[in-house]
């Protein structure tokens, strides 16, 4: 069985192959989300605590949280369900998934280090992979640098260097949800347009109602005149 061990603190992960079944037997009958003492896996993991995050069986079917079985099942899945990505709107599909209980039929088991042990694990705890991209949303940049609302977020956005041929230039993401005077002005303009359009519609509706009432009055007067004319011709 392969153990895919990740360490979110450093942003690293590594796959370790374990040939001895006795070493991975400690994970059997455990569920996704449960924690396991690393000392049972090997002396190099002494003091470590692993959390089971998921895995795949030997045919490549993923483990699904909430399916309390050590076997494979077929479930009807819709949008928002893990292990399924709909291709069309409203599409549902019955798909095979592996239960959340660990067994010997697994090929890969994903583990997360929740507590670091005494020794360093080569390629996982002794290395650090910095995040390639910084925060993009204005509030997240403020939170990241501990800024107040008065500080200008644009000065703190994380830029990255891009080398293209002989030229080296920096690139920064477009800050999302950034409140600027231009944005406030645009909002005021849109609100004023909305009010102006509503007023114009009300005036047009009132004008139409007035015209309609005038036409109805004229029609009534014409009909009354016609009735009067007929009555006078009958008398004659």
UniProtKB/Swiss-Prot annotation:
GO molecular function, one term: structural constituent of ribosome
Modified residues (Phosphoserine): 232-233
One Pfam family in the UniProt entry: Ribosomal_S6e
SMART domains the UniProt entry points to: Ribosomal_S6e
GO cellular component: ribonucleoprotein complex; ribosome
Top-rank taxon: Eukaryota
This protein's UniProt keywords: Phosphoprotein, Ribonucleoprotein, Ribosomal protein
Posttranslational modification: Phosphorylated.
GO BP term, example: translation
InterPro entries in UniProt: Ribosomal_eS6, Ribosomal_eS6-like, Ribosomal_eS6_CS
Gene3D superfamilies according to UniProt: 1.20.5.2650
UniProt family annotation: Belongs to the eukaryotic ribosomal protein eS6 family.
This protein's name: Small ribosomal subunit protein eS6
Organism: Eremothecium gossypii (strain ATCC 10895 / CBS 109.51 / FGSC 9923 / NRRL Y-1056)
Source species taxonomy: Eukaryota, Fungi, Dikarya, Ascomycota, Saccharomycotina
């Amino acid at each position: 069985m392969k153990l895919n061990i990740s360490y979110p603190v450093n942003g690293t992960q590594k796959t370790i192959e374990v040939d001895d079944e006795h070493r991975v037997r400690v994970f059997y009958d455990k569920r996704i989300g449960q924690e396991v003492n690393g000392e049972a896996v090997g002396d190099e993991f002494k003091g470590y605590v692993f959390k089971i995050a998921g895995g795949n069986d030997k045919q490549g079917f993923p483990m699904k949280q909430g399916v309390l079985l050590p076997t494979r099942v077929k479930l009807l899945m819709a949008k928002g369900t893990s292990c399924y990505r709909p291709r069309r709107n409203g599409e549902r599909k019955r798909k095979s998934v592996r239960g959340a209980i660990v067994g010997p039929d697994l090929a890969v088991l994903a583990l997360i280090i929740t507590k670091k042990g005494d020794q360093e694990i080569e390629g996982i705890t002794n290395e650090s992979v910095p995040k390639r991209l910084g925060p993009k949303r204005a509030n997240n940049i403020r939170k990241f640098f501990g800024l107040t609302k008065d500080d200008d977020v644009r000065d703190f956005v994380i830029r990255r260097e891009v080398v293209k041929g002989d030229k080296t230039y920096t690139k920064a993401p477009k800050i999302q949800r950034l409140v600027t005077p231009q944005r406030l002005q645009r909002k005021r303009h849109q609100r004023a347009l909305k009010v102006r359009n509503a007023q114009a519609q009300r005036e047009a509706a009132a004008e139409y109602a007035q015209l309609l009432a005038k036409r109805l009055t004229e029609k009534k007067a014409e009909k009354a005149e016609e009735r009067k004319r007929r009555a006078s011709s009958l008398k004659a």
